[in-house]
């Protein structure tokens, strides 16, 4: 069951960033629903079971940030589902999540990290150390 997280106050403690913290589908669905209107609930168990790692941000026991790292089994990894609760956005939580993911991913011997690029997030990507590149994309599922 999804419930809305309260908007965090300016005097709330800084979120704690952790790699590989056990997470439930309920917690992830609650976070994603707050950050991405129109989100449909999903079972995150099979997704996380195939991940190289994930990084989470918790504030007072509430999940307020998440990034998933998938990989090709060799030198390339992919940041997916980067999400920060609106109540803590624009406070550096997303940057801290991505940087922690990069450090943890490097420890696995990965040489390159890829991320889908959205123009309106360019300042965020650059702040995390990403450079824009041209990439190809083939949609396999029908829109909708």
Regions found by a protein language model. Give the residues of each.
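Conserved acetyl-CoA-binding loop of GNAT-fold acetyltransferases
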Residues: 126-136
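Short acidic/polar active-site loop segments enriched in Thr and Asp
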Residues: 75, 111, 131
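Conserved GNAT acetyl-CoA-binding A-motif
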Residues: 105-117
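Conserved beta-strand-loop-alpha-helix junction that forms the acyl-donor binding cleft
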Residues: 114-123, 138-143
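A conserved beta-strand-loop-helix scaffold within acyl/acetyltransferase catalytic domains
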Residues: 42-83
């Amino acid at each position: 069951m999804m419930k809305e997280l309260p908007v965090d106050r300016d005097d709330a403690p800084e979120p704690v960033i952790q790699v590989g913290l056990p997470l439930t589908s309920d917690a992830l669905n609650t976070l994603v629903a707050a950050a991405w209107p129109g989100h449909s609930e999903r079972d995150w168990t099979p997704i996380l079971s195939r991940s190289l790692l994930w990084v989470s941000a918790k504030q007072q026991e509430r999940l307020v940030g998440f990034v998933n790292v998938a990989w090709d089994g060799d030198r390339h990894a992919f940041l997916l589902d980067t999400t920060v609760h609106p109540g803590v956005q624009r406070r550096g939580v997303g940057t801290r999540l991505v940087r922690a993911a990069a450090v943890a991913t490097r420890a696995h011997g990965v040489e390159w990290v890829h991320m889908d690029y959205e123009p309106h997030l360019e300042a965020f990507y650059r702040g995390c150390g990403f450079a824009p590149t041209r990439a190809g994309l083939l949609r396999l599922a029908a829109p909708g």
